[in-house]
Amino acid sequence: LPYTYNRKCRDLTSDEMSENKDFVIRFKSKIKGKSILEDIVQGKVEIENNTIEDFVILRKDGSPTYNLSASVDDHLMNMTHIIRGDDHKINTFKQIQIYEAMKWDKPLFAHIPLIHTIDGKKLSKRDKASTLDDYSKIGIMPDALRNYLLRLGWSYKDLSLIHI
């Protein structure tokens, strides 16, 4: 099982907090109820709030973590739609709590299936072919790649080819 923070510092007194020299800043997540994500692709997705840990938003050195940075950046850039892989869904629930705490309008979220290599690992920019030019160099035709990407996680009736 993955590590989950046990919330031991969630309700420290001011005196207890001042005793700690090394500390991080955590977001105090909701514990009761459910959070609901209206995902553009997957529809209504629910999660029990007690499964979302009090997550770190500032490291010991004061630098922000991904969830805080992404939320602030997306808000300041007036992002209306966030499209990302399924593996970031738990981050979305954390970011929604940040948006709600800051009283910001939330963008719309879409989570799409990951693309995997022939070995079953998720495709990464560190893999050999990661740009359109790379695929062109190994002989993948643009229309074939476009058709493949269009059909990932979706199909229309029984069509194997979609003409754009």
Predicted segments, located by residue:
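Conserved small/polar residues in nucleotide/adenosyl-binding loops
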Residues: I162-I164
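Active-site cores that bind ATP or allylic diphosphates and position pyrophosphate for catalysis
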Residues: L1-K125, T131, Y156
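Glycine-rich and small/hydrophobic secondary-structure elements
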Residues: D133, I138-I140
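Substrate/cofactor-recognition hotspot
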Residues: L150
